[in-house]
Every structure is written in structure tokens, then in C-alpha cells.
């Protein structure tokens, strides 16, 4: 009995230590992480290699404590370990926990192989605010090639946005395919987009200007209250979304216009269904609303692109890929940031015209599309160059005459 009690006492700190190990994930967040990453949404930070040994050491302590607990129980006499006895139950429990924590230790050692240049390892926050360890490949081409392309004689790939330039074959290289393996066909749009889509760009504050969110909210308010057509605003961060939503809410409430704002982690489906009900509603979306949602006809008639969709450079995967490009003598902006922003831009624009009878307007609130040297690349992704206007009021006036 005394030995069993000692085993019980040995197991208690093991459980407490397990909780500490979970909390120790917090220490993997590097010192000096910018506060802007933390308020809400996708809170990401690259793993600090200096904290790895401490975390693995804590797991090792836990395993050794379990091993000591097992030795304590196994030292009991045979009667205490007979079938159905408390001693045997305690032994089985300790053995099970030891096996699970050995698996955890092995998984941690695999995920924390920071010398592996083909992956990005980082910690983020889950929905409950707890720390979560992640490991993502920098490139998926090899995985796709092994899992799909080498197993089939022929594979047909189709995409409306994958090839933003004339070099269609080059677009498949990130998928693990070589140019000489690909027969590429580029087909024109089945829709007369030049007639179906109006494109305007507002020459206002740039996204990094202090007054950008205020100007964006005011502009969306003008478009929504003037046109009274379902309006989707695509943003690139929840922080900006929240700021714009707070400024828009009183304006739209006074006009009787429904406002839907996507929350971090919120699925697009329920918001999309509510938005489709019409009524000239305004939907503020990010992430999942740039692709994969379908709003034909009057379900979406005005699309506002808040800013050109460049990825956040501090995103762990983006940062790791940028580091690799620099090491290989490339330019992260030219070789990564710009191509991926163009792809996301085309995906966002694709939310508007879904059938041959749709008609709608794209309003781009980021003046860099007209001012910057790379703006021409984004303009080429549109069916026609955008007309540059001085204000949202001018845009609304033009669109009032353009819509039937």
C-alpha cells in the first residue's frame, strides 16, 4: 500500500509537469515579437532555436518521471499487481502515458529540426489563445509530384487564375512539373468582360498612410449608400477589417444597409449565405473570401479591392521562402511577393463575374495600381485598364450611369 501511495504521489507531479510542458510552448515565441502580431487573427512567429532545448528538456523530465513511477509500481509484491488490483491499474496507466509522451518527444524532435531548410517551423495561437506548434513545407511541388503526378499516366489541370502571364507552362513549375512535361493551352474568357465589368481606381491615400482606413471606410459608405447594390470589400488583414467595420457601422445603420464583417477563423459559408439575400448589403471579408466563393447575378455587383494583396513579409512561411530566395541570389519581391499578389488579385477579381449575364464594377482603393512601377502588372490582369478617379463620390457618380 505504501508503495502504491508513493507511485500515486510520483504521478501527480508528472501530470502537473505535462501542463507546464504545454505552457512551455509559449517560450518558443521569440523575444521582441511585434505587438501587432498579437491582438487577434493569425498570430504567427518563427520558432526561436534557443528555446528548443528547454522545451525538449521539459518533455525529457516528464518521461523520466513516468519511468520512475513505473519502477515504483513494478517494485510492489505480486499480490499488489494481481489482475484487477489498483497496483496493476496504476502500472497500466503509467505505461500508457509513457508511450504517449515518447511519441510526443519524437514528434517534437521531428518538427523542431530547424536545420531543415525545406520547412518553416513556427508557433501561432489557436482559437482559444493557446500556443500551437506548426511545421509547413516551403514548396509543395515535390509532394504533389510524388503523391499525384508520378502515379498517373496523364493529369488534367485547369485553372482560371493560375497563369497570369502568357508563359502558362512556367506556372506549373511550383507544382512539381517541368516545362517539357506540360502541354499547355490558354483559352480566352467565355464572358465579354470588357462589357460586363467596369473598373475604377481611386487616387486616394496609400495603404501605409495614417488616413487610409478612414478614407476606405468613407469611400465604401459612399458607394453603398449611393448605389444600393451588394458590395463585397476584400481586405488583407483582420486589423484593417475591424477598423473599417467600426467606422462603417453607424453610416450603414443610418441608411438601413446590412453590414457583415468576417471574424478571425470564421467560415465564409454562413456570411456568404446571409450576404446573398440582397438588400444592398456590404460584406467585409479577408482570407477565404478572395477565392472559392460564388456570388452570381445581383448577389454581388460591386467589388472593392481595399489594397493590392501582398502577403505580410513577417509571415513565417513567407519569411522563410524569402530567405531561401536571397540565398539563391534572387529577389524576394520580384520572385515571390509580386507573382503571388498577382495570383491573389486575379482570384479576388474573379468573385465578380460568374455568368454570361452578370454585370458589376471593380473599385480598387489602392492607388499603387496607378502610381507604382509594378502597378502595370496588376492593370494587365484586368479586362481593361481601370479609369482613375479622384474620389469615391466620383466613382459612385460614374457607376450610377453605368449600371442599368
What is each residue range found by the language model?
Residues 1-404:
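ASCE RecA-like P-loop NTPase motor cores
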Amino acid at each position: 500500500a505504501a508503495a502504491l501511495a508513493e507511485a500515486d504521489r510520483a504521478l501527480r507531479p508528472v501530470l502537473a509537469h505535462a501542463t507546464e510542458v504545454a505552457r512551455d510552448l509559449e517560450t518558443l515565441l521569440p523575444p521582441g515579437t511585434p505587438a501587432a502580431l498579437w491582438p487577434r487573427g493569425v498570430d504567427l512567429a518563427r520558432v526561436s532555436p534557443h528555446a528548443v532545448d528547454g522545451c525538449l528538456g521539459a518533455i525529457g523530465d516528464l518521461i523520466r518521471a513516468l519511468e520512475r513511477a513505473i519502477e515504483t509500481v513494478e517494485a510492489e509484491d505480486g499480490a499488489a499487481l494481481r489482475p484487477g488490483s489498483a497496483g496493476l491499474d496504476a502500472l497500466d496507466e503509467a505505461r500508457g502515458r509513457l508511450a504517449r509522451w515518447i511519441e510526443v518527444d519524437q514528434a517534437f524532435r521531428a518538427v523542431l529540426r530547424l536545420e531543415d531548410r525545406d520547412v518553416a517551423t513556427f508557433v501561432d495561437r489557436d482559437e482559444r489563445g493557446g500556443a500551437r506548434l506548426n511545421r509547413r513545407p516551403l514548396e509543395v511541388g515535390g509532394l504533389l509530384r510524388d503523391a499525384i503526378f508520378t502515379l498517373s499516366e496523364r493529369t488534367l489541370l485547369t485553372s482560371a487564375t493560375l497563369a497570369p502571364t502568357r508563359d502558362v507552362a512556367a506556372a506549373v513549375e511550383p507544382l512539381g512539373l517541368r516545362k517539357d512535361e506540360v502541354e499547355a493551352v490558354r483559352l480566352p474568357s467565355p464572358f465579354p468582360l470588357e462589357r460586363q465589368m467596369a473598373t475604377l481606381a481611386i487616387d486616394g491615400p496609400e495603404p501605409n498612410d495614417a488616413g487610409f482606413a478612414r478614407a476606405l471606410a468613407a469611400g465604401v459608405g459612399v458607394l453603398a449608400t449611393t448605389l444600393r447594390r451588394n458590395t463585397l470589400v476584400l481586405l488583407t488583414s483582420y486589423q484593417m477589417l475591424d477598423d473599417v467595420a467600426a467606422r462603417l457601422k453607424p453610416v450603414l445603420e443610418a441608411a438601413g444597409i446590412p453590414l457583415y464583417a468576417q471574424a478571425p477563423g470564421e467560415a465564409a459559408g454562413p456570411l456568404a449565405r446571409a450576404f446573398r439575400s440582397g438588400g444592398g448589403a456590404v460584406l467585409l471579408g479577408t482570407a477565404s473570401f478572395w477565392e472559392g466563393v460564388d456570388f452570381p447575378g445581383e448577389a454581388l455587383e460591386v467589388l472593392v479591392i481595399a489594397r493590392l494583396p501582398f502577403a505580410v513579409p513577417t509571415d513565417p512561411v513567407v519569411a522563410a521562402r524569402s530567405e531561401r530566395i536571397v540565398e539563391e541570389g534572387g529577389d524576394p519581391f520580384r520572385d515571390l511577393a509580386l507573382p503571388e499578389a498577382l495570383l491573389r488579385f486575379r482570384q479576388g477579381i474573379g468573385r465578380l463575374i460568374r455568368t454570361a449575364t452578370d454585370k458589376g464594377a471593380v473599385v480598387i482603393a489602392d492607388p499603387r495600381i496607378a502610381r507604382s512601377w509594378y502597378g502595370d502588372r496588376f492593370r494587365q490582369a484586368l479586362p481593361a485598364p481601370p479609369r482613375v478617379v479622384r474620389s469615391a463620390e466620383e466613382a459612385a457618380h460614374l457607376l450610377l450611369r453605368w449600371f442599368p
